[in-house]
Amino acid sequence: MFSQKINYSHLFTFSITLYVEIVTGILGHGFIALVNIMDWVKRRRISSVDQILTALALTRFIYVLSMLICILLFMLCPHLPRRSEMLSAMGIFWVVNSHFSIWLTTCLGVFYFLKIANFSNSFFLYLKWRVKKVILIIILASLIFLTLHILSLGIYDQFSIAAYVGNMSYSLTDLTQFSSTFLFSNSSNVFLITNSSHVFLPINSLFMLIPFTVSLVAFLMLIFSLWKHHKKMQVNAKQPRDVSTMAHIKALQTVFSFLLLYAIYLLFLIIGILNLGLMEKIVILIFDHISGAVFPISHSFVLILGNSKLRQASLSVLPCLRCQSKDMDTMGL
């Protein structure tokens, strides 16, 4: 249980950092979705990779926007967290949103692997020719894990909320502390309330590790494919930096960035849930929450830099902003 009051300097630092992350996430994911949708309207068709990127950007845009809405709700209605229905509804919403965010990113890695990797295996070629169906099957199969996750969370929520209601002395004297703990613990919003959270950790970690493992396998297979391709180029005495090699490298950069950010996210999720004694130090708590929000927000800029169309669109926006700034300076605004 938490027993100390929040230091206002820590709370101020936490709030400023989180607001910057939220604004950055809204701009980043909103930009990806806007560029792809405008291109879709212009060309009247959209590629498979752009479909995945757009769905991923919209999912994370909603996630980041919901964080801002929840902050405003808790500021305007500080007694809102006492309602068990609100706890359950927000928990389910963030689980669903986080689920599709992670699995769509996994689908992106699998898509790059099947499109770029070169293997003569008949099963791989079968999947390569049916990459759209493979992605659809992955999404549909992930719904099974989503259902199990929601059911597990629902069962656990009943015990956690009951424990919270039965121990009103825990946070009724300091609702601000409960609000921040509840609000920014990602899809595990009630784990920091009771000391029994370590019981639920293996179940929650399982749902998190499944897409991570799939992405890791795709990443390793891409490395193996690049190694084979590089050896083939050496035998044929061709330039190592051919089109296929560059495609491998770009795909590896995209998948690796996801794995790195996701590994950091999982690390701090485990720290936040498992080491409850450590989390009594408010500095560690703040750092844990901020680190958890970095993953879905910072990944948008990795996607922009890794996609030629998005990168060119971002470069075209920057000169416009500079020109607008110069015009405003000229007008004395």
Curated annotation (Swiss-Prot):
Report the GO terms under cellular component.
Answer: membrane
Q: What ranges are annotated Extracellular (topological domains)? A: 1-13, 82-90, 156-205, 275-281
Entry membrane topology: Multi-pass membrane protein
Q: Which residue ranges traverse the bilayer?
A: 14-34, 61-81, 91-111, 135-155, 206-226, 254-274, 282-302
Q: Name one GO molecular function term.
A: G protein-coupled receptor activity
* Presence of the UniProt keyword Transit peptide in the record: no
Q: Which UniProt keywords apply?
A: G-protein coupled receptor, Glycoprotein, Membrane, Receptor, Sensory transduction, Taste, Transducer, Transmembrane, Transmembrane helix
Presence of keyword Membrane: yes
List localization entries.
Answer: Membrane
Name the CDD domains on file. 7tm_TAS2R14-like
Q: Which InterPro entries match?
A: GPCR_Rhodpsn_7TM (IPR017452), TAS2R (IPR007960)
Glycosylated residues? N7, N167, N186, N195
The biological process GO terms on file are: detection of chemical stimulus involved in sensory perception of bitter taste
Highest rank taxon of the organism: Eukaryota
Tell me the tissue specificity: Expressed in subsets of taste receptor cells of the tongue and palate epithelium and exclusively in gustducin-positive cells. Expressed in the duodenum, antrum and fundus (part of the stomach).
Q: Which residues lie on this side of the membrane: Cytoplasmic?
A: 35-60, 112-134, 227-253, 303-333
Q: So what family is this one in?
A: Belongs to the G-protein coupled receptor T2R family.
Write out the function statement from the record.
Gustducin-coupled receptor implicated in the perception of bitter compounds in the oral cavity and the gastrointestinal tract. Signals through PLCB2 and the calcium-regulated cation channel TRPM5.
Note in the entry: Several bitter taste receptors are expressed in a single taste receptor cell.
Protein name per its UniProtKB record: Taste receptor type 2 member 123
Query: Which organism does this sequence originate in?
Result: Mus musculus
Starting at the broadest rank, the lineage of the source organism is: Eukaryota, Metazoa, Chordata, Craniata, Vertebrata
Task: List the gene name.
Answer: Tas2r123
